[in-house]
Amino acid sequence: EDIIAMVALYRPGPMQFIDSFIRRKHGQEEITYLHPGMKNSLENTYGILVYQEQFMQISKEWCGFTGGQADTLRKAVGKKKIDLMKKVKPEFVEGAVKVGGATREMAETFWTQLEEFANYCFNKSHAACYGLIAYWTAYLKAHYPDAFMAALMTSDHDDTDRLAIEMTECKHMGIDVLSPDVN
């Protein structure tokens, strides 16, 4: 779960919350929610909006959105469709006030956070896939460094800039890089 969260947080939208996420995880910062009605959706991520599914759940529970409306919101946010977001915003704010018991100011504040979050946010399944690849990659590099670096350099054989970086990494790891030898 931690790797998945870090993959999702390391994006331009939620990246600003990485330090807070870590402090909250380790009990060094209080976990807060803009509204108590968000606790169910944000509890697993220490009160921080990390995944698309979370704002979809909040829109259903806090704003009274249907599944279809929540999916429209996801499309608007995920694809940065500004016109669609402007169309959905009044429904979201009104729903938060009427259904969720939020103040208009609170609903507007969350909407602003949602707009910031829209910058390249991930759904959890994408983060999980990338996290799994990152885990495998780290495992292979740690346990089979020679083979890993050889495969990496082979895959980048036509990119001299990448090869230079990888050769420096080999040197740092204590791996000898030998020049081609036909004998």
Predicted feature residues:
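Noncatalytic, beta-rich nucleic-acid-contacting surfaces in large DNA/RNA-processing enzymes
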Residues: 1-183
